[in-house]
Structures are given as C-alpha cells and as structure tokens.
Amino acid sequence: MSASPIENLIKSLAVMPGLGPRSARRAALYLIKKRETALYNLAQALDEVQQSLVICPECGNIDSCNPCSICSDPKRDDALLCVVEEVADLWALDRSRLFAGRFHVLGGRLSALDGITPEDLSIDALVKRVQSGKIKEVVLAMNATLEGQTTAHYITDCLEKYPVRITQLAHGLPVGGELDYLDDGTLAQALRARRPVS
C-alpha cells in the first residue's frame, strides 16, 4: 500500500537540514492549513527553481542565468578569487558586500571520515583558473573546522607553485563576544591572529 500524500509531504520535508520528523510534521500541517497561500506559493516556487536553476560552470554558484550574475558582473575584480566550501558560504560572503572579486565553490571539504577526497571537489577546476594567470590573490574562506583547515592546506600545496598570493580569512573573536564564553580554540586563534591597534 502506498503512502498518503500527507505522509509523502512529511517525509520530503524531514530530509531537509534542520527538520526532523516532528518539525516536518508541523511544517506539513501548516502548509496544509494555509494551502491557498503558503502551499500554493511554495509549490510554485519549487517548480520555478526546478525549471530555471543552473549551476554556474565558472564558479559553481547556483543562479538562474549562465554564467551566474556574479561571474557576469563586469564590476568585479578578476584578480581576486575567494574559495568557499559551499554555495551558502558564497552567498553569505557576497551578502556582506565586503568582497568584490570572483568566487570558486569547491562543493564540500576534504574529509577522510566521510570519504571525500580531492577528486570529489572542484580543486582541479580551481587550479585551472589560477593557471590562467588572471588571478593575483586567492582568499581561502574555509570553515574553521579540522576538515576546512585540512582543505585549505591541501589547496595551498596545490597552488604554491603559481605566482599567486594565498590568504586565509582571519578567525577569532566574534563582534560582541565575551571572552569567558569562547572556547579555547577560538581564543587561541584570536591571540595568534592579533594585530597592532596603531
């Protein structure tokens, strides 16, 4: 006997990050209750996403145009390339409006535990972009995890033979953070990355 449409909706929602079975059930009930607005709008948005989204062949961003709006922006600095693990990281950095260069999405990070090797990531495409000679600085914007830092070191090794400056995002104290609430690793990194005030 096949599952009901409601059960299928709950199962589909439950696979999303941050939604367990209970949250998925609540979300499904909300959508059903508001089916004239919320459910219809969600279904329409999902259909549009399915029909129009493209993975940019240049950087790996997800957009509705090819190349993506970032890669096709002539105001961006071609000499700066920011390497991120996932599209969500690209979106977060771009939303800050503090980086005006290009991006490269790896599609994950190296992880022996999860069996993710360099071949599973777009590291070869990154090296080809650097080989083009246009890029003068590569900013490694990996997460401050063991896997993120392992990935950053691997990329550094891959790029060290090219005439490109390799930098990494600073890690340390969050704005508004209090010292007694920070973990030892964050405090140690903040101390190592300290800079003069004048």
Curated annotation (Swiss-Prot):
Keywords: DNA damage, DNA recombination, DNA repair, Metal-binding, Zinc, Zinc-finger. PANTHER family: RECOMBINATION PROTEIN RECR. GO terms for molecular function: DNA binding; zinc ion binding. Gene3D superfamilies: 3.40.1360.10, 6.10.250.240, RecR Domain 1 (1.10.8.420). Residues 79-174 form the Toprim domain. This is Recombination protein RecR. Coiled coil: none annotated. The lineage of its organism: Bacteria, Pseudomonadati, Pseudomonadota, Alphaproteobacteria, Sphingomonadales. It holds the Pfam family RecR_C. Belongs to the RecR family. May play a role in DNA repair. It seems to be involved in an RecBC-independent recombinational process of DNA repair. It may act with RecF and RecO. It comes from Zymomonas mobilis subsp. mobilis (strain ATCC 31821 / ZM4 / CP4). One of its GO terms (biological process) is DNA recombination. A zinc finger (C4-type) spans 56-71.
